[in-house]
Amino acid sequence: YCLTINTTICAGYCMTRDINGKLFLPKSALSQDVCTYRDFTYRTVEIPGCPHHVAPYFSYPVAMSCKCGKCNTDYSDCIHEAVKTNYCTKPQTFYLGGFSV
């Protein structure tokens, strides 16, 4: 089954400056602020059609408030461009002329 979930996220631009002389600074001084979560919670939905031996629950984050700060990899995807999976990845059965393919 595909299930549509609407949630809120943190996104946007933060004021930042690029430092000259990057070769002489530690890597920790080179990080820039990003729009990230100040406070968030998790909501859980039940996925229909799961087998009885499978827990039919999916939890997802909901942004309560945002801030400009360092990206925390404990709960955020901090890469430049995330993998785009805006489609249902479960294999679908296609029917052509009454026959399943």
From Swiss-Prot:
Keywords: Disulfide bond, Glycoprotein, Hormone, Secreted
Glycosylation sites noted in the Swiss-Prot or TrEMBL record: 6
Entry keyword annotation includes Disulfide bond: yes
Molecular functions per Gene Ontology: hormone activity
One GO term of the biological process aspect: G protein-coupled receptor signaling pathway
Keyword DNA damage: no
GO cellular component: cytoplasm; extracellular space
Disulfide bonds: 2-88, 10-66, 14-68, 71-78
Localization per Swiss-Prot or TrEMBL: Secreted
Main location: secreted
PROSITE patterns: GLYCO_HORMONE_BETA_1 (PS00261), GLYCO_HORMONE_BETA_2 (PS00689)
Family named by the database record: Belongs to the glycoprotein hormones subunit beta family.
Complex formation: Heterodimer of a common alpha chain and a unique beta chain which confers biological specificity to thyrotropin, lutropin, follitropin and gonadotropin.
Function summary: Indispensable for the control of thyroid structure and metabolism.
Name recorded for this polypeptide: Thyrotropin subunit beta
